[in-house]
Each structure stands twice: as C-alpha cells, then as structure tokens.
C-alpha cells in the first residue's frame, strides 16, 4: 500500500503511455468542479486536477466491496442454507484543497446496496428495487494547521475505537464489524430519532499529535449532535450533545504519518515497519439512550491494540484486539415503543494474521483466525462466542484483495445488538430472550479501490 493511497482518496499515478486514462478521469472530475476555478487547471496525474497554485486541487477515487454468502438456516423457510451475492459497499471519494491549510472531503455510499430485494423475506420494492440508493456519507471541512492543532468540521467518523476508524475498507479482515455497534452505527439516520449513520455524525473534531521520547501520541476530542428525539417521543428531550475522544500511543512506527487525520487501519502489510499502538476511547451523551419514560445516559469505554511485526523472512505478523464496555438503557425501557435501545454489556474481539513473503501469481496469501465474545448484562443464558477462520489473497494492500472465510457463532442475530443478542423481553420481563440457534456461514469476497 502506497503512502498516498488512503480511504478518502486514491491518487492514481499514470504514465504518459496511459494518457487515455488521464483524459477519462479528468473529464469526469471536471464535470463536478466546472465553474469552481477561474482558469482551466492542468492535469498532472490521473484522478487529480491541479491549478497553477499547488495548494488548489481536486481528486477522485472510488471503491467497491462485493461478496457471496452461504448461511446456514437463513433461507426464507428458515430450514435451508441461504445463498446470496451482494454489493456491500460502493463509494465515490472526492477530495480537494482550497488553501495550504484548508481542504475538504465529499464521499458517497450506496446505502441500500446490501438490501436484497427490499429486505429480509420481503418482495422487491421501489427505490431501484430497494438496493441501489446513493447518498452522502462524508462532508468534511478540514482546517489542518500543524501537527498539534487541527479541526475537521461537518459529517465525519466519531473518534472511538480502531475498528470504527478503519471503516470497512481498511480492516485486515473483510467483515471487521462483529462486536456491538455504537450509537452512530445502529441508528441508521440523522435528524429526529436518529444518531448518525455508518459511524458518522455531524460535529467538530479537534485532533493532533505529539512525539514524547521518540514515541507518538495521537489525541482526538470531539462534540457531535448524537441522538435527537422528537417532542414527547424518545429519551433526549433536552437536546444534549454527544462527546467522544480517543488517545492513541504508538511506541514504534508513527502510523499516523501515513493516515488521513485521526483515521486508522487494521495493519499495514509491513509497509511501515514494526507497529505497536495502544489506545483508549469513549463516548458520552446524557439521555442518549432509552425512551421518553425511561431515559438513560449513553456511555462507552473502549481499549484497543495493534501490533505488526515484519519478520526476518519479510513475512508480516499482524495482531488486533479490542475490548468494549457499554452502559445504556435500563431493562424497563425495552418495553417502550419509543425506545432507542442498544446493547448493554461487554464485548471482546481479537484476530491474528500472517502474510507470507512469497508472491504467488499476482498476490500473497494471508491466513488468519478470529475470536469474538459478547456478553449482555440483561441476556438470559450468559455470553456467546463466535469463531472465524479465513484466507486473504492480497494483490495490492487494501486496494485489491480477495477473501474467503468460514464463521461459526452461537446465535444468528448479527452484530447490531451483539451477535446472537436480541432486544425482546422474556415472558417474566426479567431479561432478554437469547437467539441461541447455532449458525455457520461461508463467505467469499472482493475488495477494490482506485
């Protein structure tokens, strides 16, 4: 992975003999920025248009993630394996510079691409058959002054755990999100009744970096809208804001020298040498969960670690681990129709990978294993486990990768409230009914960025 190939934009280096590609990309981008500059800009590389002022430019990138899943007992009948091809993500990245210290990001996402035929067990619906709506995912004004003082304003990722800041494209495994979702993930929308989407929210992030004793410390503090509630419906009747922060300590290589802002990756395929990063993060919003009758503060504490070692034979060992603790709504809120209910409890996930040094064909193989444990404070029957083993075929880092893996868990409800966990009260009203059905799944997937 080259240094300039980030999740926000991929600057394409095109030789003179590929002039046709320069013209194609430049033409598409110029349609987006026509009238924004008073003079016709020069094209120096495919995907980037620059004016005579090197601080003024605009770049275009894109990424897709598509997969095939065969899931046990997930068919419409509930008794057969379900077999589904899906487009999980389809994004267009637009980045630009206006001044030496002022930049912007505008990214889109196919929000309903993973909706198959209008929904689970549902018929095809409207909106391009229910699976193709494109929309805004990032809109960020960036004021980047020094290593220590920077501000991002607009719609951006909430600075919490590494798993969130990796986004879907910069995990070392294809499906990085197996622990319970945060507030801005689970809501799926903005405005009244929503708390953000895709890990994003509208707000301001202050971040920077210092280098004590040859190490590297990243800090990020932020304030966001968080959950909004309508009058008489939902917990946040006082329109309180959400606060989030992350503190990351890199003891070896300075990984943030290669990442945009406070964003992260799940590893670097050995491109930046040895990496050891320890981090803590958290969120808080008063009356951020629960219901009108039973509001509660939303609180999280998260710790994560990344260790990557380049071995003597040029193979690369990568290790990720993450611990999350959620304090959310009371048990009484689950029976309220207006409850913004979330997972309440602890989770832990860890995975290890080894990238072989030998190139076979056009890429290198990377086997891995993963374990996830989730335990709700209200769930009947205790915690639940999930095991995953897989193989990546890495062609060009995060920009071109094939994956195949097998997953086994003790419940099939997915990660939104924790794998296998539900939000349904038991008959006595003393706990939540578990989804204890065993579930296996096989997935083959492709990820591309350019």
What are these regions (language model features)?
Residues 52-53, 238, 248-377, 385-387, ...:
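Detector for outer-membrane/organellar transmembrane beta-barrel domains
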Residues 74-77, 121-124, 184-190, 286-290, ...:
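Extracytoplasmic loops and strand-loop junctions of Gram-negative outer membrane beta-barrel proteins
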Residues 46-229, 235-255, 259, 342-358, ...:
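Outer membrane beta-barrel
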Residues 1-20:
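N-terminal secretory signal peptides that target proteins for export/translocation
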Residues 20-33:
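Sec-dependent N-terminal signal peptides
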């Amino acid at each position: 992975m080259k240094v300039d190939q980030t999740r926000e934009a991929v600057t394409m280096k095109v030789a003179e003999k590929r002039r046709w590609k320069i013209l194609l990309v430049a033409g598409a981008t110029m349609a987006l920025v026509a009238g924004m500059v008073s003079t016709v800009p020069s094209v120096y590389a495919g995907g980037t248009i620059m004016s005579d002022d090197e601080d003024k430019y605009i770049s275009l990138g894109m990424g897709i993630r598509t997969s095939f899943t065969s899931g046990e007992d997930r068919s419409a009948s509930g008794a057969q394996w379900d077999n589904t091809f899906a487009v999980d993500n389809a994004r267009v990245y637009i980045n630009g510079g206006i001044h030496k210290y002022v930049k912007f990001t505008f990214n889109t996402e196919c929000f309903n691409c993973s909706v198959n035929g209008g929904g689970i067990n549902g018929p095809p619906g409207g909106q391009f058959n229910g699976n193709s709506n494109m929309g805004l995912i990032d809109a960020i004004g960036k004021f980047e002054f020094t290593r220590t003082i920077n501000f991002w304003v607009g719609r951006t990722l909430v600075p919490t755990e590494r798993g969130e800041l990796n986004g879907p494209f910069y995990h070392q495994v294809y499906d990085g999100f197996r622990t319970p979702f945060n507030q801005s993930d689970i809501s799926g929308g903005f405005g009244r009744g929503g708390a953000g989407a895709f890990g994003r929210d509208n707000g301001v992030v202050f971040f920077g970096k210092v280098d004590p004793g040859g190490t590297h410390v990243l800090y990020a503090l932020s304030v966001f809208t968080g959950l909004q509630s309508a009058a008489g419906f939902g917990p946040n009747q006082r329109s309180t804001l959400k606060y989030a922060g992350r503190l990351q300590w890199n003891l070896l290589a300075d990984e943030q020298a290669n990442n945009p802002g406070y964003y992260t990756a799940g590893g670097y395929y050995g491109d930046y040498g040895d990496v050891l990063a320890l981090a803590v993060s958290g969120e808080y919003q008063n009356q951020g969960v629960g219901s009108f009758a039973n509001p509660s503060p939303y609180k999280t504490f998260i710790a994560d670690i990344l260790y990557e070692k380049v071995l003597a034979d040029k193979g690369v060992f990568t290790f990720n681990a993450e611990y999350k603790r959620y304090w959310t709504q009371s048990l009484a809120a689950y029976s309220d129709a207006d409850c913004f209910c979330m997972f309440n409890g602890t989770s832990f996930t860890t995975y290890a990978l080894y990238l072989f040094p030998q190139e076979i064909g056009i890429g290198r193989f990377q086997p891995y294993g993963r374990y996830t444990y989730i335990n709700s404070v209200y769930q009947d029957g205790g915690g639940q486990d999930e095991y995953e083993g897989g193989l990546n075929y890495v062609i060009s880092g995060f920009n071109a990768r094939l994956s195949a893996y097998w997953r086994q868990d003790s419940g099939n409800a997915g990660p939104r409230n924790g794998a296998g966990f539900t939000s349904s009260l038991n008959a006595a009203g003393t706990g939540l009914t578990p989804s204890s059905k065993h579930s296996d799944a096989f997935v083959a997937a492709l990820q591309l960025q350019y």
